[in-house]
């Protein structure tokens, strides 16, 4: 099927109504307009058209019958924008991101909205042993490897195929030895925007050599919209009675501990900021929440609920469903106001959060954790969903 690229101008409302229409041939200059305190951003397709490592990037849009929209670029297999209706039926862009590929390339935080691999989260000291062979990865997070190394999947151009107005497919061949991971790994990520306001993410991979992998999406959310302030009054519920505590470098200790009577207990809906400043060693290590939750599930359950988040101003609810055993809850602790988002606001401290479905961090070195090993002949398949309501 011929690749379909989004070639018009997309008008995004950060805190209000948005519309999208094709306007080929018009100026590609970006500008903003403000009407009744609503900032409208013109996201220009030309700003996402670039050649990187000999491959072309573009902008792609998905729509549903409710006027919801999900906009992607194949640079990093990345979610750029996600428009959902709030309690007043106005459209809100709940994903923070940038207005050009160059902005993503130059960001001090490279993971906004990206597909993460080959191994999401951290591997201690960038080392692991597989089939008796020792591997040393590039360490890009202090002494550890984070999100695949120096050049993870967020920095590559994926092959894009827009199946229809609801679905887009991204493909990438991660070659044997890339970032020192073994095996030629064929990866397919399919994003679908359903008429139930679900953004479904289906991951599939196969390898010709035994390897490890842990795929996820790293969207940064603010359910009140970009520029609406911090996310500390967002209400969070996580369906997990346990979590994996970490050391000072955010590597799991190997223990699995109960969340009860700790600031990590979100088994009932609680504001993110309610206990984030508590005197707790784990919060000190993460500078807030940056921890993996061990999700409550049974073997009989295929897709199960991992979390629910509600925007205090918008009334938008995001329910997270997954087949994965873990969920990384990140409260935007390392956002440093060094980047400007597509609506003009900066990435200020804790103005977005992440809910990353995953296997546990450092699994290749933790025999007590669910395995992340993939062998030739096996097919890696997993799905997660962000479902929105108001």
Which residue stretches match the model-derived regions?
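Bacterial N-terminal signal peptides that target proteins for export
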Residues: 1-8
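An exposed, glycine/acidic-rich loop-and-rim segment of catalytic or binding clefts
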Residues: 21-68, 74-390
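C-terminal motif of bacterial Sec signal peptides marking the signal peptidase cleavage site
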Residues: 16-19
């Amino acid at each position: 099927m011929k690749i379909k690229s989004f070639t018009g101008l997309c008008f995004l409302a950060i805190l209000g109504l948005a519309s999208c229409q094709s306007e080929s041939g018009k100026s590609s200059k970006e500008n903003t307009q403000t009407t009744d305190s609503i900032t409208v951003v013109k996201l220009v397709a030309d700003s996402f058209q670039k050649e990187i490592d000999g491959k072309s990037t573009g902008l792609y849009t998905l729509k549903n019958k409710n006027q919801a929209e999900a906009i992607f670029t194949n640079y990093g297999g990345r979610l750029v924008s996600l428009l959902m209706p709030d309690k007043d039926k106005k459209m809100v862009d709940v994903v923070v991101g940038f207005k050009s590929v160059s902005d993503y390339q130059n960001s001090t935080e490279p993971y906004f909205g990206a597909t993460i691999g080959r191994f999401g989260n951290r591997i201690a000291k960038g080392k692991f042993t597989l089939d008796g062979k020792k591997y040393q990865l590039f360490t890009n997070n202090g002494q550890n490897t984070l999100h695949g190394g120096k050049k993870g999947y967020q920095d590559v151009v994926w092959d894009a195929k827009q199946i229809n107005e609801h679905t887009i497919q991204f493909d990438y061949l991660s070659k044997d030895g890339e970032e020192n991971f073994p095996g030629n790994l064929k990866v397919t990520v399919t994003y679908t925007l359903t008429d139930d306001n679900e953004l479904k993410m289906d991951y599939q991979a196969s390898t010709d050599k035994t390897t490890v992998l842990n795929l996820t999406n790293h969207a940064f959310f603010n359910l009140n919209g970009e520029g609406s302030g911090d996310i500390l009054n967002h209400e969070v519920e996580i369906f997990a009675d346990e979590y994996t505590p970490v050391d000072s470098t955010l590597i799991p200790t190997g223990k699995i501990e109960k969340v009860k009577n700790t600031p990590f207990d979100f088994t009932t809906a609680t504001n993110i900021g309610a206990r984030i400043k508590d005197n707790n060693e784990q919060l000190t290590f993460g500078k807030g929440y940056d921890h993996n939750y061990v999700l409550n599930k049974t073997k009989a359950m295929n897709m199960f609920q991992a979390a629910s988040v509600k925007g205090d101003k918008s009334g938008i609810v995001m329910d997270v469903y997954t087949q994965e055993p873990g969920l990384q809850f990140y409260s935007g602790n390392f956002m440093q106001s060094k980047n400007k988002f597509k609506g003009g606001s900066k990435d200020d401290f804790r103005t977005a959060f992440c809910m990353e479905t995953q296997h546990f961090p450092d699994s290749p070195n933790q025999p007590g954790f669910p395995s992340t090993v993939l062998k030739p002949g096996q097919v890696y398949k997993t799905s997660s969903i962000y479902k929105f309501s108001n």
